[in-house]
């Protein structure tokens, strides 16, 4: 008795299923990495203000950062403004994450504008 070859449609379904699950994994990783990069950047910027009395002119002015911090800082766009700073997340893991934080998160921070802020 001859074994039948797998149907092409089954193969297509498997490939599509894998593709869709990979997209979900990427979106989840973008969220997780984007969140971590944003919070790390905020912490480093706010620490700079505590130490030196003002926000840095650029992210290159941050002192005593670690190698992993550079990954986070490379995922955000920073601009110092008169009354604080603007901080946007430009990259999560691969793509741009869609994040939001409650009003309480922003209290006491110098972030005056962000693509993560409502």
Language-model features: locations:
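Low-complexity, acidic interaction segments enriched in glycine
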Residues: 31-39, 46-118
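Sec-dependent N-terminal signal peptides
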Residues: 9-18
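Bacterial N-terminal signal peptides that target proteins for export
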Residues: 2-10
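Bacterial signal peptide processing site
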Residues: 24-26
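C-terminal motif of bacterial Sec signal peptides marking the signal peptidase cleavage site
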Residues: 20-22
């Amino acid at each position: 008795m001859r074994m039948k070859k797998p149907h092409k449609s089954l193969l297509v379904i498997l490939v599509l299923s894998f593709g869709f699950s990979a997209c979900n994994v990427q979106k989840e990783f973008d969220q997780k990495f984007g969140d971590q990069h944003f919070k790390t950047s905020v912490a480093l910027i706010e620490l700079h203000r505590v130490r030196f009395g003002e926000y840095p002119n650029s992210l290159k002015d941050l002192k005593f950062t670690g190698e992993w911090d550079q990954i986070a800082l490379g995922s955000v766009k920073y601009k110092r403004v008169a009354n604080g700073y603007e901080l946007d997340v430009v990259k999560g893991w691969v793509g741009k994450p869609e994040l939001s934080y409650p009003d309480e998160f922003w209290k006491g921070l110098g972030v005056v504008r962000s693509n993560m802020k409502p």
